């Protein structure tokens, strides 16, 4: 007897990926808020019922808090734009979260470089 794998995780991944691509385009082309600068969408996590989506973003320059506030204020506008593009029954409510991974990586690299340089001086 063959067991059937659930397609839900794969579909959820596809929906998250499509939301990420469409949101990136909407933010770049249609969002006119000056607080939103060079935003990179890192990932999108959608709840199993597609009611909510956490959208993780990073910035090249700018104030992360102001950008997060601007994106969350524009969430309804962006969700409406997704309605026109996505062919799913429920378009999730968007929640934008600043992703500090790149900052942490830069801090770790700086600490490693400092440790290596201080070790070189001791020898």
From Swiss-Prot:
Keyword field: Cytoplasm, Ribosome biogenesis
Compartments it resides in: Cytoplasm
Transmembrane segments annotated in the record for this chain: none
Domain of life: Bacteria
InterPro entries named among the record's database cross-references: KH_dom-like_a/b, RbfA, RbfA_dom_sf
MF terms (GO), sorted A to Z: ribosomal small subunit binding
Keyword Cytoplasm: yes
GO biological process terms on file: maturation of SSU-rRNA
One Pfam family matching this protein: RBFA
SUPFAM superfamilies for the chain: Ribosome-binding factor A, RbfA (SSF89919)
GO terms under cellular component: cytosol
Quaternary structure, from the entry: Monomer. Binds 30S ribosomal subunits, but not 50S ribosomal subunits or 70S ribosomes.
NCBIfam families attached to this UniProt entry: rbfA
UniProt record similarity statement: Belongs to the RbfA family.
HAMAP family the UniProt entry points to: RbfA (MF_00003)
Role this protein plays: One of several proteins that assist in the late maturation steps of the functional core of the 30S ribosomal subunit. Associates with free 30S ribosomal subunits (but not with 30S subunits that are part of 70S ribosomes or polysomes). Required for efficient processing of 16S rRNA. May interact with the 5'-terminal helix region of 16S rRNA.
Protein's UniProt name: Ribosome-binding factor A
Chain's gene name: rbfA
